[in-house]
């Protein structure tokens, strides 16, 4: 049995700009100046290290706390190989904490790190271990929500296009905001919405 020896969380903070005032999560803030995520490193008794990432934004401190205070104590000393069983074993006693937010972000990081370890044991890159290439994936820019501010929408769509993106994801909810996005760029640019 290959046991989990340690789990470490590492908060990563990168410079970030929203491109203007935004609306949505923590709307009291005019703009973010950093983007955070939490990396997880799992070390095992066979000398390997697996890595995973927990979604961050404003939730990074919560995800980090879940990893350090809840999940790590439940996992250290346990088998690292039976991944689906291990994740299900974690989810059962924690179901009362919900199926979204920092708990799920933290579980996702643990899950990814365990699969990374399995791929290393198979001497394969993780993407090949999980089934290989699935074809061409189109990159896209995912913009913030600008609360219908058509000028901010147009500016940020144009900025994303200038960086080479041909597909842009909008979080806007009004028709004028979509019109502003469409009018800001050529017709061959694709717009998607969540």
Model-assigned labels for residue ranges:
Residues 192-194:
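Conserved small/polar residues in nucleotide/adenosyl-binding loops
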Residues 39, 138-140, 166-169, 188-190:
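Structural preference for beta-strand elements that scaffold enzyme active sites
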Residues 151-166:
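Alpha/beta enzyme core
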């Amino acid at each position: 049995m290959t046991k989990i020896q340690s789990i470490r969380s590492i908060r990563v903070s990168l410079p970030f700009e929203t491109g203007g005032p935004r609306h949505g999560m923590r709307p009291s803030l005019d703009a973010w100046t950093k983007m955070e995520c939490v990396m997880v490193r799992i070390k095992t008794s066979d000398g390997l290290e697996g890595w995973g990432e927990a979604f961050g934004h404003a939730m990074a401190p919560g995800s980090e706390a879940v990893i350090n205070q809840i999940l790590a104590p439940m996992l250290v000393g346990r088998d690292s190989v039976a991944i689906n069983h291990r994740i299900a074993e974690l989810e059962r006693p924690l179901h009362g904490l919900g199926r979204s937010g920092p708990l799920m972000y933290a579980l996702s990081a643990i899950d990814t790190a365990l699969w990374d370890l399995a791929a290393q044991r198979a001497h394969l890159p993780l993407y090949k271990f999980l089934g290989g290439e699935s074809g061409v994936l189109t990159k896209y820019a995912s913009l913030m929500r600008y609360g219908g501010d058509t000028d901010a929408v147009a500016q940020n769509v144009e900025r994303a296009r200038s960086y080479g993106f041909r597909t842009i994801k909008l979080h806007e909810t009004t028709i004028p905001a979509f019109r502003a996005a469409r009018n800001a760029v050529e017709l061959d640019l694709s717009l998607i919405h969540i």
